[in-house]
């Protein structure tokens, strides 16, 4: 069920990050070097999840692995124990909550019309449902953290924190962001561009679907314009 996926990606996945933040406040102040294995594992896990995204053919699996990779960055940022890292982690959790939920919602609208989640079989939607393609484009741009979105602000804060702690981490972060951009564009091009493979008549999009997407992306854009609300 799509509602379960949306709640899981938007709220439940963030509870782990919230739990780590709360535990960090309870524990006595420790040197960041103690958390070095966890930081390296989180960054390496983010890259592996991103690489897994590149070889996915199932739309929902791709979005799910994308969520996992972003949570790796959140864990690494929290473990650094700096105000910037904490702000970046909180901002990324909120931004990615909106984005991943919107992507799952879009995946469901596509599935309801094609009855398949295979990327290559859902192509050509920009000719049939141009407004839905616009929502796909906006959601993917937010997922790959293009400015001026909150995703970009949060990833910039996390990148600054990790670079300040250890300059070598910029290699892992840069690689992670490059792969994120690659699979986000691949997902958009695979589902929207090219000739359509549908022979039957496609049902038009409903107002409730557009309202649902607007309620995901408009608040995110508004927070992006005034990030002081959460940072």
From Swiss-Prot:
A GO molecular function assigned to this protein is: NADH dehydrogenase (ubiquinone) activity
Subcellular localization(s) per the UniProt record? Mitochondrion membrane
Any idea which UniProt keywords this protein has? Electron transport, Membrane, Mitochondrion, NAD, Respiratory chain, Translocase, Transmembrane, Transmembrane helix, Transport, Ubiquinone
Catalysed reaction(s) here are: a ubiquinone + NADH + 5 H(+)(in) = a ubiquinol + NAD(+) + 4 H(+)(out)
> What are its GO cellular component terms?
mitochondrial membrane
- EC number(s) reported in the record: 7.1.1.2
Q: How does it sit in the membrane?
A: Multi-pass membrane protein
Instruction: Give the GO terms filed under biological process for this record.
Output: ATP synthesis coupled electron transport; electron transport coupled proton transport
Record field: transmembrane = 1-21, 34-54, 61-80, 84-106, 118-138, 169-189
Q: What does this protein do?
A: Core subunit of the mitochondrial membrane respiratory chain NADH dehydrogenase (Complex I) that is believed to belong to the minimal assembly required for catalysis. Complex I functions in the transfer of electrons from NADH to the respiratory chain. The immediate electron acceptor for the enzyme is believed to be ubiquinone.
Give the record's family classification: Belongs to the complex I subunit 4 family.
Database matches in PANTHER family: NADH-UBIQUINONE OXIDOREDUCTASE CHAIN 4
Name the record gives this protein: NADH-ubiquinone oxidoreductase chain 4
């Amino acid at each position: 069920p799509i509602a379960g996926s949306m709640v899981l990606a938007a709220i439940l996945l963030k509870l782990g990050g919230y739990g780590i933040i709360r535990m960090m406040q309870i524990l006595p102040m420790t040197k960041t070097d103690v958390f070095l294995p966890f930081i390296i594992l989180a960054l390496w896990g983010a890259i592996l999840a991103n690489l897994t995204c590149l070889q996915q053919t199932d739309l929902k699996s791709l979005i799910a692995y994308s969520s996992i990779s972003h949570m790796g960055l959140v864990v690494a940022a929290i473990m650094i124990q700096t105000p910037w890292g904490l702000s970046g982690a909180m901002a990324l959790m909120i931004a990615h909550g909106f984005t991943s939920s919107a992507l799952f919602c879009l995946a469901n609208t596509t599935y309801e019309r094609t009855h398949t989640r295979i990327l290559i079989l859902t192509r050509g939607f920009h000719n049939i449902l141009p407004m839905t393609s616009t929502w796909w484009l906006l959601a993917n741009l937010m997922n790959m953290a293009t400015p001026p979105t909150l995703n970009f602000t949060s990833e910039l804060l996390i990148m600054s924190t990790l670079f300040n702690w250890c300059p070598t981490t910029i290699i892992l972060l840069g690689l992670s962001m490059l792969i994120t951009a690659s699979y986000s564009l691949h997902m958009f091009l695979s589902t929207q561009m090219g000739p359509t493979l549908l022979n039957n008549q496609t049902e038009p999009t409903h107002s409730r679907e557009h309202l649902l997407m607007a309620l995901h992306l408009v608040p995110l854009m508004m927070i992006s314009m005034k990030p002081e609300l959460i940072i």
